[in-house]
Regions:
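Short, Gly/Pro- and small/polar-rich lid/capping loops
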Residues: 1-49
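Conserved beta-strand/loop scaffold segments within soluble protein domains that form the structured core
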Residues: 36-264
């Protein structure tokens, strides 16, 4: 269950960068086990002791660094739940590349639930990239249920770029984001479903601080008899700006329900 094999390499080339290597700041989780990890001078990764997951500490001196935290599940019948916390100090500038790929050639469900929390201090800039992908000719389902919590301090910025490439039978995404004064948020969700697949995204963005802003964009393709639901909600509690955009291409007998909501 803990071996790095050709399937692992193929999935990493899709959800991370081509020719993923054990360099820089990284942690590779494979079938519920951390295969390898590494630190840099300004990025430290520590495994939690009370539950599965890790704490990632990013120094304010980190400028232009990239952190890789991919997950691969390729043994049928695995349910993997992981809790990851990212602590980004004031002034840091960092890219975090996440994502999960599932290969299922068996008859049992493969499932990964990633609970990610980002604690972003003043004037820090974060780009978060997440790709989800499924493959395999087994009858077992490939399920991904991510939960993302983001807390933005004054003058910080966060770009969240997510993509569900293909092959995920069921996904339920829950996202909660809080913005303080002059914090900036951009969310881009790209999603593709086919066959009988289903996808649900619920997102709540609370703008507590004056001059905070949020842009939320969803672009999706639905094929076959797949079903998608996208429900983003922007809540303004101060002078702020919010924009929500939902674009879909609907094919065959697929269904898409977009419910953009602004409450201010």
């Amino acid at each position: 269950m803990g071996l790095w094999n050709k399937i692992t390499d193929n999935i990493l080339n899709i959800i991370d960068l081509p020719n993923f290597s054990s360099e820089g700041a990284y942690s590779l989780r494979h079938n519920g086990v951390v295969l390898c990890q590494g630190d840099t001078e300004f990025v430290k990764i520590r495994q939690k002791t009370d539950k599965p997951g890790m704490d990632v500490f990013i120094s304010g001196k980190a400028k232009g660094e990239t952190v890789h935290v991919p997950v691969v599940v390729d043994s049928s019948g695995i349910t993997d739940i992981v809790y990851n916390d990212f602590y980004i100090e004031a002034g840091a500038d960092v890219t975090i590349i996440s994502g999960c790929g599932i290969h299922n050639s068996g008859c049992n469900e493969n499932r990964h639930d990633g609970i990610h929390s980002f604690h972003v201090q003043k004037s820090a800039a974060v780009r978060y990239e997440e790709k989800h992908y499924g493959e395999g000719d087994g009858t077992g389902a490939k399920v991904l249920n991510p939960t993302t919590n983001i807390y933005l301090s004054p003058n910080s910025s966060f770009i969240m770029d997510t993509a569900q490439i293909r092959g995920v039978d069921s996904t339920h995404r829950e996202t909660f984001i809080e913005l303080e004064e002059n914090a900036k948020l951009q969310v881009i969700e790209k999603l593709m479903t086919d066959g009988t697949q289903s996808a649900v995204t619920n997102m709540e963005v609370v703008m507590n601080g004056s001059d905070s802003s949020a842009q939320i964009i969803s672009r999706s393709v639905a094929k076959g008899t797949s079903v998608q639901t996208f429900h983003p909600k922007a809540i303004g509690k101060a002078l702020c700006h919010a924009h929500i955009q939902c674009d879909s291409i609907i094919m065959d007998q697929a269904e898409v329900c977009s419910i953009p909501e602004i409450n201010a």
